[in-house]
């Protein structure tokens, strides 16, 4: 996909998508604030789209100060934004969300999207796939690279297959901890201390525990599973 609109004809219309359902919602908002401040207004027209913690797409604030990390900003409300999947690249606003025959208006026909979502639903290939379906150019890795890069277990498998050195690990699929906890404990014990227990598909250091005593392993696994049923030790 390419950005067909020339900057000499008009400003490039950039949709910033931020917030989201992950535990890094506030950090994503702060990222949007930084990008808003950095984009040259003579070259780019910014279209802010926020995603609430429960997954609603809404018109986002256009003032970067309102999204500063120091304010721990969250996206909570706004007119619903819908993304057309008909290759028109249009974002449509429903001014009467939930109503019958609500008024809809075109917010913008965007040239490119900057996905500024952190963690699940933002860096894992999901929004990238949605934008591919809508035929909207976007910044960043594609679906496969995003999905593989987000999944720590998949990435280790790919690196090992490419002949690169990979540290020893234990992959714990969703049902294994429930059905074979003793087996997981035994494999983890064989790795030696300290252990790092991680959600396989969470961003930053969310849900990660450093284990220096095997008596703390169960609690670390349960903490990681709060963020992802697949975990890595």
Predicted regions and their residues:
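Active-site nucleotide/adenylate-binding loops and adjacent lid/helix of ATP-dependent enzymes
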Residues: 2-17, 22-23, 30, 103, ...
């Amino acid at each position: 996909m390419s950005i067909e609109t020339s900057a000499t004809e008009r400003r490039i219309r950039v949709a910033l998508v931020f917030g989201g359902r992950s535990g890094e919602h506030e950090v994503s908002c702060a990222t949007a604030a930084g990008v808003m401040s950095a984009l040259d207004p003579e070259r780019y027209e910014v279209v802010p789209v926020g995603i609430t913690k429960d997954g609603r797409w809404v018109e986002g604030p256009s003032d970067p100060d309102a999204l500063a990390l120091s304010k721990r900003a969250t996206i909570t409300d706004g007119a619903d934004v819908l993304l057309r999947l008909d290759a028109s690249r249009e974002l449509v606003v429903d001014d009467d969300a939930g109503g019958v025959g609500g008024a809809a208006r075109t917010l913008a026909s965007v040239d490119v999207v900057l996905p500024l979502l952190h963690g699940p639903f933002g860096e894992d290939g999901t929004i990238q796939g949605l934008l591919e379906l809508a035929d909207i150019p976007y910044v960043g890795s594609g679906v496969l690279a995003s999905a593989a890069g987000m999944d720590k277990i998949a990435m280790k498998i790919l690196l090992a297959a490419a002949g690169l050195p990979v540290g020893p690990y234990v992959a714990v699929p969703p049902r294994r901890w429930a059905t074979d906890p003793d087996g997981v404990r035994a494999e983890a014990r064989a790795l030696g201390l300290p252990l790092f227990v991680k959600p396989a598909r969470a961003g930053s250091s969310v849900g990660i525990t450093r284990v220096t005593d095997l008596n703390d392993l169960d609690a670390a696994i349960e903490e990681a599973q709060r963020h992802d049923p697949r975990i890595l030790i």
